[in-house]
Amino acid sequence: MRTKKGYTLRPLGTEYILVAEGLEVADASRMISMNSTAAFLWMEVEGKEFDAQTLIDLLIDNWEISRETAAKDVDVLLKSWKKADVVVDD
């Protein structure tokens, strides 16, 4: 999968906001809130091919977290990204 074009990640206090901008995005008024971990993952894979395993490995490599916990967290994150329509399956 890939992140969709037309989104800009912006810091807002301790959170991050993914803002829809540009012609590629149908609803430019949408904003998606992310915590710092989700924002880190977004920045690491933005514009690149990735899968759940890529995100799991990034979590394990950067935080002291078990593979099982990372897999559960990535599952929740990907569901939210897909629901928000900010990623596309290639």
Role assignments for model-derived ranges:
Residues 30-90:
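Long, charge-rich, low-complexity alpha-helical segments
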